[in-house]
Amino acid sequence: MGIKYSNKINKIRTFALSLVFIGLFIAYLGVFFRENIIIMTTFMMVGFLAVIASTVVYFWIGMLSTKTVQIICPSCDKPTKMLGRVDACMHCNQPLTMDRNLEGKEFDEKYNKKSYKS
């Protein structure tokens, strides 16, 4: 079994979703410290800030998603958004590139770094 590739936009959305659940869990932990109002409030505020951070990440990736190149995946024939020089299909995780110099090369995320010279 080969390496499982994942789309960058989906990775960031998954991170934002995990921030929501982590924030809710941290805020819920504050309930166990009802006797000490300072600790309870601290847990609730940190949890709230994590949920707000997830909102910011969702907003950021939404704005970034509007600027991406939309292409049709040659493997599954569904439209997908591509971020950077190399990315994976959102639906079938097929490695994709629009750079002719990278066609046929092994998929590697280092190709998206500015320091990489092809």
Curated annotation (Swiss-Prot):
Localization (cell): Cell membrane
Keyword field: Cell membrane, Membrane, Transmembrane, Transmembrane helix
Annotated membrane topology: Multi-pass membrane protein
Top-level taxon in the UniProt lineage: Bacteria
Transmembrane segments: 12-32, 43-63
Assigned protein family: Belongs to the UPF0295 family.
Main location: membrane
A GO term from the CC aspect: plasma membrane
Protein name: UPF0295 protein BCE_0593
Pfam family, one: DUF2614
